[in-house]
Design a protein with these regions (language model features):
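Short, well-ordered, aromatic-rich surface patches in folded extracellular/luminal domains
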Residues: 81-92, 96
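DNA polymerase processivity clamps
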Residues: 1-79, 99-213
Length: 213
């Protein structure tokens, strides 16, 4: 299993690998998740790439400290550095996710995600959006009556209700929804959201505490 958190504490990640990954044992963190996502999707690493776990001796034990990326011909390389166990434990100790009851659970399709991207582009000055239900429609809102604004139906015919109107970070949610895999999205009126991405190799839970606008 794996647990990580963005430096600004907007996203907590909990992952379970379906099979043991060689070299990935112990506790470590994944800083700058957007950089890791970019590296994993670079065309140079799509076929026959060599991605290895770098290890080092620390306090008498061998621990992973990063990933080394190298393309098939060995002329394109990158290194991604893990966060140490001590730093991870310090960062995570105050934000342990205790779990909530989910009021809405959906599996967004590519058309809904594309519409989300269009509204985000049209309202690029907005860093957060509000998720609320109107009847059986789950709607996302950008801006408010005092400025430019927009909204759209993200998913129709949902079960449950969201009435509080919590705000969520646009960039982080869009980044997660762009990841490859089967996606499930959950919202709680208590002020939490979780996006689960099943890549086939692992299942990643991206947990987002609500933000005040």
């Amino acid at each position: 299993s794996l647990e990580a958190m963005d430096d600004d504490r907007t996203v907590i990640v909990q992952a379970k690998f379906k099979e043991q990954v060689p070299g990935l044992t112990g506790t470590f963190g994944l800083p700058n998740l957007s950089k890791l996502n970019i590296l994993l999707n670079i065309d140079e690493y799509k076929e026959n790439a060599n991605i290895t776990v770098n290890e080092q001796e620390r306090n008498g034990e061998t621990v992973p400290f990063g990933l080394h990326f190298e393309n098939a011909t060995g002329d394109f390389k990158n290194d991604y550095r893990f966060m140490s166990k001590e730093v991870v434990e310090e960062k995570l100790k105050s934000v342990k996710f205790k779990g909530v009851n989910w009021d809405i659970e959906i599996q967004p399709n590519s058309a809904s995600i594309a519409r989300f991207k269009m509204q985000a582009q049209a309202n690029s000055e907005e860093t957060v959006f509000v998720a609320k239900t109107e009847g059986t429609d789950l709607k996302f809102f950008f801006g408010d009556s005092s400025t430019h604004a927009g909204n759209f139906v993200f998913q129709a015919n949902v079960e449950g209700a969201l009435n509080t109107g919590w705000s969520w970070p646009v960039a982080q949610v869009l980044s997660i929804l762009s990841l490859p895999g089967d996606i499930t999205m959950k919202f709680s009126d208590a002020g939490a959201a979780m996006i689960t991405v099943d890549s086939g190799m692992a299942s990643y839970d991206y947990i987002l505490p609500a933000q005040s606008k």
